[in-house]
Structures are given as C-alpha cells and as structure tokens.
Amino acid sequence: MSPNQEPGTTARVFGHEFLWTAQHPRLQDIRKMLHTYDELASDALDRLDVLSPPSDKSPGGCPMQKRDLYALLERYSSSDQAIGRLWNQVTDIPDWVDWDQIRRGQKFVYQYYGQVQLCLLFTSLLGGMGAWRIVETLSRTGGFGVNVCRRRLLETLLHFVQVVESLDSIKPHGRGFASSVRVRLLHANVRRRIMRLEKQRPGYYDTEQWGVPINDLHQVGTVVAYSVSLVFLSLPRMGVFCTEQQIADYLALWRWVGYVMGTPVDWMSTPATAKAMMEAVLVSEIKPSSNSQIIANNILAAQTNSPPLYASRQFLAALAYRLNGEELATALNIARPNIWYRSLAGLQGAMLNLSSSNYALLPQAWQARRDKKLIQYSHNMVTNRKIGGLEGTTIFELQYMPEIGRMTEMGRVNISFWQRVTNYIVGLFMFFSGMIFLHT
C-alpha cells in the first residue's frame, strides 16, 4: 500500500522527516522505472559482441572478460548504427552542462574530501544496501562476498577519484568519462546475464517484484546515494552544512556523470527537485532485507583492520551509525557500538572539519597544490598494492559472474588481538601522516 502523498502530509523514513509537496514524484510513477532500462547500452553491447567477439567466452555466455569495451565502442562508433547511437549520446553535450559549475563541484569534493569519502563508503554503499530490490541483483553477482568485497569497493573508489580528479578527466575522452562509460556497459552485461539465467531457470530472478536488473529507478537511486543524500543527509550528520551554491555545484557534477552512465537525470535540474526525488526513492526502496544485512555486514568485515586506516570493526560500526542514523543501521543488523567508539567517530569528524575549515581561505596557488597532492594520494591509495590497493588501474570488466545457485553469504575475517593492536597503531600513523602530507 502506497503512503498518502497529499501535499502537506508528514512522512518519515529511517529518521528523515519531511512534508510531501507537489514537487515530489508520485511513487506509482517512479516505480514504473523498475521495468525500464538503458536500452542504448544493451543494444551497443550486443553489437560489440558481434563485431569483436571475446576470445575467452565462457560456457555461460558472459562475453566481457579481457576486453576494453570503451575502446571498442569508440573504434566502431562510426561504422555501426547501434554503437554510434550510444557514442553520440555520451559525446553530444546537453545544453544544461556548465563546465565551470562542474569544476566547482569537483573543488567542493577537494575541500571536504575526507568527509565525502566516509559518506560514500558508509552511506552511499553500506547504507545503500537498505534498498531491498537492488541487493537482489548484487547478491547474485558474488562481488560482495567478504573475500572479494574490498576489491569491489576499491574499484568504486577509483571511479570516483577519476570523476573528480580534473575537468578534462570527466569531459568526453577523459579518464573519468571513459570509466563512467565502462561502468555503464558493465551494468548492461550484468543485466543481460541475469535475464538469460532467469530465462534458463524461471524463478531465478523475480522481475515482477524486483524489476529489470539494474533498471532506471535503481540507476536513479545510485546517483541519489552518491550526490543528493550526501549533501542533504550524510554531510550534515558529520557537521558539514553545505551552502546552496555548493549543493547546486556538486549536483551538477553528478547530473553529468549520471547522464554519461545512462541514468535519467531530468529530476536533477534543481536542488529542490533532486531532494524531492531522493525522498520519494527513500520511501519507495529503502526496506532492508536479510540480503541487505548480509552485504552491509560484509562491507564492514572487508574494511575491518584494512588499509589505509586499519580501523576496528567497532569503530567502523560507530561510523555506520553516525552517518546512517540509528534506525537504518539497526535495520541493517550492524552491531551497536559503545560510547567509546561513538566518541572516536565524533572526534574523527571534528578533526576532518577542522582540516577543511581553512580551505576557502587559502590562496588559489596553495589550493591547487593541496588539490594535486590529494589526487596523487588517492590514486596511490587505490592502485598501490603495497598499501592495500588494486595493483594498477581497472577497465571495469565483469569479474563476478552471476550463476544459478550463487548468492552472497555472510562472511567474517579472523584476526588476533595483537594484530588488532598493531593495526590500530598503524592506522593512527597513516591518518596523521596523510593529514601532514596534505598540509605541507
């Protein structure tokens, strides 16, 4: 049963209270997007398989391994109609794109980089697992098992770093742009794979209840998690209250990224309509299931005592409660942290806010130097295997293949007391050395 959306009616969802207005989309309307999807990418992917068949095609028909689909897309864009349609869509710049505003959105990230990264991990990713329909797709890929989850998180972080590293990176042919297109084609491949398995064994994936895998609504929800919920929910919980200009600039960045990734983005034309969509999506989609709990806890387990901060499970849980609120964190079955770890989480937020407070006062040359160091540090953290990175970059190929009978299970990481103590000391060293690096 849908809630009463009469304008002026109060709604409350996991600690967030708001009034329904005429700007809010009707739930029955946004739920129609459960059954629509990015057909441009699907059609282009089918043609790429014909023009450049994979050399190592699996028996299950999952043809994406060892191919850079972005390079192939560009190569065949002028000679194939379906591929050309997708290429033209991502390279023809819409009238609403303002590169100066997008650059300001990137610089907003630089100012609050530590806070934004924590919000992305604990709200966009971990908290986003409360979306009960989305996790049905994620559970079937196996990419959020505890032993492989960290790589999945690093790939997501790499994409984000490439998106914000420079304006040229997010423009057509740039590194962040290319990664966004690769992720779009990855989504098309996962969707196709799951639908083939459903056809092979009816009941494997319930499209009536969950919608098409990686549908338009869930694409919207993903962009909401990375942008709107971050500025309206997550950052304020860390004590960062964005100005109207900062909000508009950051949303402009993600409107463009979402567009490149094949997401409907008209609802992002103003911060007010974006906030209204966020609230409607929260009411419609955030209902944590048992699979939500499994994946959320696997994310925590994968990050426990891992570089760069080597944080304990209790400290990570405290961050999860701080950034998602008591209700959602409890619904995700995250163990409740004690007052000590909650205090540490609050102290970390205060230190990050103190570090960010002087950014706007710095001369532009100093800001540019700090920004450059920040991007270098981030790339090193993600790609340097010696400190827990990926050992290089990635082309976002399909590594976690949906299979009949494969579902993500709850995992755990065992670590001794002395390892925890050592990791705690190393984590403190990494945190403070990183702060010193950025400010010298």
Show where each model-derived region lies.
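Mature, function-bearing regions of proteins
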Residues: 1-224, 229-440
